[in-house]
Amino acid sequence: GVVAWTGENAETFVGLYLSQFPVGTIPAKLTFKAAADSNSVWMIVSGTFGERRLNLRRPETLPYIVANKDWVPVEYNGNTTAGSPLDFSVYLDAPAGKYGPVIINRDGHFSFRDAPGKRIRFFGPNLVGTANYLDKALADDFVTKATRLGYNTVRFHHFDNGLIDPNASDSLTFDPKALDQFDYLFAELKKHGIYSCLDLYASRELKPGDNIKELEGRSSPEKFILKRLIPISESAMDNWKEFARRLLTHRNPYTGLTYAEDPALYALNLVNENPLVITWQGWDPALIPLFEERYVEYLKEKGLDTPENRASRGGLFIEFLNDLQIRSIEEQKRFLKDELKLTALVTDLNMTSKFTLNSAREHLDFVDNHQYWDHPMFPVAAWQM
């Protein structure tokens, strides 16, 4: 057999073998015994019968390092000693934004407006939910640890709900305390050479005072419903614009700049994980007729209105969804760059690798796409420092 899984328990290194045994006809009973000279603890996790032989290729033996005179276990707690070999803050070029806004240079790399030959690659974490809103002491501690890890970017993610005044009738009124915490953290990151990016919509929960036409009379709309509504609803688009306006034209008292003009904000994602080819059906079927009505209008404009095409959810329908998405992206970009004078790069459609999204992604400054490995799980306090 081959080692199919490895891990550790409190005492030692453990593994599971994937083995196969020819048995001929289906037996009434099978007995397995450990080798006589084995001092291991053996168990059978599962078994199955099959007619096909497995191709069990034996991979190269992976090294397993144990504590000894040459290897000492290190428990990481973030408190890297300043100036030590593990302090990577020396590689940061502070403050963030010193070379002007980040641009895409002629070779397709991240660079700077005032130093186009100087490349930068971004490496850093997401801050999610309440992790975006820290008191000043904790913010200082986080920034110190982040710089010593060599991080040069932080993504403010799912920050939108925490920024909203819980007592307001809409989801557009900011909470002054939360805004101050956001401003301070951004400014400290900037001061130490860490660039920021954010999503203008991730999970902001709508309220009755938002006056979204398509949601009138509905008490509890789907949590992420704005993702689907923005491309087809004028009032939803206006709501997105107003949130963006209030955030990006706000002058951070710790930097003296608005977010729209601050080069330390190097990128904005319009709407988090929103490709209509994935989201148009959503969890709430109530919006599906809105897309179907728009699809019929699209077919009529193209001279393709037939019963077969109306029923299709294949290529024509995907082209229709991409057309909606492109129109939405272009309007959002126009608003940000022409009206708000945004200097940051703009991206969107940051989920899935479907080739059908290529035509829409051509309308972005750069492509941001998400892949997940070992996604965090929390036994106690989710997404908190």
Question: For the regions a protein language model found, what residue spans apply to each?
Answer:
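Mature N-terminal, pre-catalytic/accessory segment of carbohydrate-active enzymes
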Residues: 1-126, 132-137, 141-145, 149-152
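Active-site mouth of glycoside hydrolases
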Residues: 42, 99-109, 113-377
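Surface-exposed acidic, glycine/proline-enriched linker/cap segments
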Residues: 383-385
